[in-house]
Amino acid sequence: MTKAIDPGSQPLALQSLDMRSRDIFRRIVDSYLRDGEPVGSRSLSRILPSSLSPATIRNVMSDLEHLGLIYAPHISAGRLPTQAGLRFFVDAFMELGDLSDEERRTIEAQVRASGSGATLEHMLTEASQMLSGMSRGAGLVLAAKNEVALKHIEFIQLEPTKALAVLVSQNGDVENRVVELPAGITVSQLHEASNFLNAHIRGRTLAEARTEIARIKEETRAALDTLSQDLVEKGLAVWAGAESGLPARLIVRGRANLLENVTAQADIELLRHLFEDMETQDGLIQLLDLAEQGSGVRIFIGSENKLFSLSGSSLVVAPYRDKDARVVGALGVIGPTRLNYARIVPMVDYTAQLISRMLR
């Protein structure tokens, strides 16, 4: 069992690595990210300076293993980076690439084309598909449901003092809430309140609808009687109260990419866990919370990502924001721990910035 590096001791571990150890460690990680296979001292000796013998390299590898940076998956096998080693590499050694002009144009053209006259969900779905195609991992987008544009609201009387508020979004989702009715309200007044709301909420998110109704408060008083006004306020209030509990929508594209080059039964089992995690809504809000905690792209390796921890996958994720700079969703790439982090980080970052600009 390999000892993992305690996060607080990483600076000390970094200081203890001389240039030769750093070079060997970097070559091991580079080889793993490229091929996914263990690398041995003999293979390393062929690509390192000729002054380093296999025996010298083995001694350095032993030190790296003692630090918890690498491990041997089998007896007499080469070495692979541990999860802690990958985190150490990402934090201390990784040099981020930059998107080419062609890649930027491709991302911008695809996202903007999908957003032109289309629903927000369609644009986010296309962004997920695009991230999958460019990363060879699975692209994912998490959108808070309360940010979907609204289409229609209707009040259906259940009892003299209760009604069902039915909210329909432009993507076809339907949500129901029971609201308390003001004493003495009639069916005609229910229709009045519904018609007034529909005239002002269509195409707006729930947050925007609340802001708009507050803005036209005087108009509301002039157009509606007291009981209908009360119902309008209660109808929006019940949705506002449930807003934080609305489930998030996870859009995933490119699952098939994760099946490429998978042969070991253990890897298949890990993928099974990952697919199960992506099918459940439980805990998806954690993903949004993780993205919200940072101002830009965040990288979660293996069990650092609690949502998909059983699958041993890595996640590169960034938040996107609305016109008020509020985090309203997250997007990214999930895949094996040997993701091409240096290329995927700027890709995710640029896509998140682009979608944020389109939501303003």
From Swiss-Prot:
This is Heat-inducible transcription repressor HrcA. Negative regulator of class I heat shock genes (grpE-dnaK-dnaJ and groELS operons). Prevents heat-shock induction of these operons. InterPro entries: GAF-like_dom_sf (IPR029016), HrcA (IPR002571), HrcA_C (IPR021153), WH-like_DNA-bd_sf (IPR036388), WH_DNA-bd_sf (IPR036390), WHTH_transcript_rep_HrcA_IDD (IPR023120). PANTHER family: HEAT-INDUCIBLE TRANSCRIPTION REPRESSOR HRCA. It comes from the Bacteria. Belongs to the HrcA family. One of its GO terms (molecular function) is DNA binding. Transmembrane segments: none annotated. The keyword Transcription applies. It comes from Mesorhizobium japonicum (strain LMG 29417 / CECT 9101 / MAFF 303099) (Mesorhizobium loti (strain MAFF 303099)). SUPFAM superfamilies: GAF domain-like, Winged helix' DNA-binding domain. Pfam families: HrcA. Keywords: Repressor, Stress response, Transcription, Transcription regulation. GO terms for biological process: negative regulation of DNA-templated transcription.
